[in-house]
Amino acid sequence: MPKIRLMVIDDSLFFRTFLTRNVGKDISIEIVGSYGDPVEASRNIQALRPDVIALDMEMPRMRGDEFLRTVMPKHPTVKAIVISALSGNVFDAMHAGAIDFVGKPGSTPGFDESKFITEIIQKIKVASTAHTHRYTDQRPVAARPAAAAPAARPVVSGASSKNVIAIGASTGGTEAIIEVVKHFPANTPGVVIVQHMPPVFTKMYAERVDRICAMSVREAKNGDRVQQGTILIAPGGDEQMYLRQDASGYYTYLTPGAKVSGHCPSVDVLFDSVSKVAARNSVGVILTGMGADGAKGLTEMKRMGAHTIGQDEESCVVYGMPMEAYKKGGVTEQLPLSEIANAVLRRFSGRR
């Protein structure tokens, strides 16, 4: 089997050396180029024919997202992953065509060198077989009135949502989620989301989605009420997120927990909890992602009466999680990404 041809672009000589030395030990990966200057790197793509490019976000002369917007149209078969310090700009690179990203050492708590290299190698391998997609422009919605300062949790400051939309995604999901929720009007039932992502980045991602959507979007906290017009995104880290219910309605319950289906937070944990308390009042959506997280939970949601939707293979960056859910019989309908928002909204037509 041919080796994955990898190009590394980072203005730090120390980090380039660290990365090429360690990633190059994997027998399935061949380092074909290492550059500190993205402009120089772009001139050599045609000759070196990399399968995957691992690049920094903040570099002299050209940012990572600018590099991708320049290179991807000319070399559409090349895949990219971003290795970035803590910055919301990483999501600009995702929109420009990057398959995935990894937080640089020091950008996320508890750096483990061995775990970091293992994660990068895994993401390089996934990226090499992923599908690339071009997404539509993400224009912010008209400005909303500033939200009131949150009260002690749980809060009941808005209309409690009688229905719940639960969404799970992994590789390629940051853009896929936006492609769905940007079509939701401000009065859409409450949405809860698990997107596999490093700690801290989820807050920046929620802020980005909030600028684009008509709904209010934020990183979830323990006890947040699931309210009409609000999207809650599970924080990355060591807490699992569950949906709970009391006399006032649905709320999020976050608690430290072991990985489930290989992840924390886990889509399976969220979906399974939704099946127990929302059942027929919920819609479950599983989007692009590697592995099987969410397949069991979505199947349980369907068994309990929820309507379930899986993204189809053609529109997925990685057709893993939706495929496993489909194989288990957990998908009511399988749809292209562009049709999922309307399918969700049809289920709640006339009821919130």
Model-derived features: positions:
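Conserved acid/base catalytic micro-environments in cytosolic active-site loops
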Residues: 2-4, 13-24, 28, 34, ...
